[in-house]
Amino acid sequence: MTAEIISVGTELLLGNILNTNAQYLSRELAALGITVQRESTIGDNHGRLADFVNEAKQRCDLLVFTGGLGPTADDLTKETVAGCYGDTLAFDPEEWQKIVDFFTRTGRKTTPNNRKQAMVPVHGHKVINNHGTAPGAWFEQDGHCAVLMPGVPHEMKAMWTESVRPLLLARQNCTLHSITLRVLGGESDIEYRVRHLLENTNPTAAIYCKTGECEIRITARAETDSSAEKMCRAYATKFYDLLGDAVYDEDVTGLEETLVHTLKEKGLTIATAESCTGGMIAQRLTNVSGASEVFGFGFVTYWEQAKAKMVGVEPAVIAKYNVVSAPVAAQMALGAAEAAGADIAVSVTGLAGPNGGDAVRPVGTVYLGAACGETVYVKKLFVSRPDRALVRARAAQTALELALRLAQGKVPADTQALAKSARHDAATLTALDSTFLKG
């Protein structure tokens, strides 16, 4: 089956809204084995939309629309597409009552123009919206299908999961199973190592890049659930063989979820001391339900005085080695662990830019510490692109990776170890600093 994704809304063409719906649907359709041939954005104009739909019907089997289902005059998707599929719309009292009830619950008056949202296909069928007021629609003509969903991302995703995806699966006479591997590292390196596995047709595998990691989504099609699952699992094993422990988990939302679960399993706690990341690590941890069982203290120590007062960094160490240095990162991590009484603590100090930096410490230089027991491990990170948001995101990701390796009982890669007992020793700190400056 082939498909096109059509996003409707002049606001998208003006750049006022980021179109995340198309990205989401591309991945979801690919996971169903449906080939997306084109993604398009059309403004709120009946004539142009109708012309486009009639052309697109000749190119593919399925049209997937988002947007233009609301109550205003420029919400034209439903009536336009209905006409292109030889259908009409009729008022649905049940949908109208749902709309009235929704407005009543939220303490608002239902205006007459909202009746437009209660218009549903006569020959096609409505698609229930359990999370908003605009129902979707499904049209068919001569074996060609069109599905219409709201433009609001959370409504669209819920409708896809609850209604549209099952409809499409039922039409394929097969079942699908997917596994998403979470892999630490850059896209080009990971893709090169597994490139021959990406050419398979069943199961399929696709890589999606994120900051500091990638997702590999493996999808198998078979006649039964158990067969599809076995195919997926067997193919996933091939990726594990090639990537080793760079694969840190499966089917999780991110590194923080795996870290929190690992800390729970091991009965460990964690603390953070952040400078340039300004609480991003703590935020990611607390995004995970149940994080309070393992995370109790997060120190944001942006000023030098805060580093000294809150996590015990010696002012003399800052003066001698610079606030962005390995000795400071080490003392921050050890101090955070002690102040919080935590088993593990991570620290970050760096230059996120765009201002500041010099030849020794250019913008993008970050030092991280990861303390556990009697040892602190220090790592230097350099983000070559001087993008403040990217530097901070990479730093937070790296800190979580260091913490995960310690929680797993492993020594983090590419780090220098410093004994807790030597954290005030001038010669040891100088040697640590020199090691990174030489590198």
Could you say what each language-model-derived stretch is?
Residues 48-51, 75-171:
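Proline/glycine-rich low-complexity loops and linkers
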Residues 140-212, 217-219, 227-232:
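Accessory alpha-helical/coil subdomains and C-terminal extensions
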Residues 1-39, 226-230:
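Glycine-rich phosphate/diphosphate-binding loop of Rossmann-like nucleotide-binding domains
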Residues 3-5, 146, 270:
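Conserved hydrophobic helix-helix packing surfaces used for dimerization/oligomerization
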Residues 26, 30-55, 91-132, 306-344:
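Glycine-rich oxoanion-binding loops at beta->alpha junctions
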Residues 8-10, 65-73, 150, 221, ...:
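Glycine-rich beta-strand-to-loop/alpha-helix junction loops that act as flexible
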Residues 227-439:
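Short alpha-helical segments enriched in small residues
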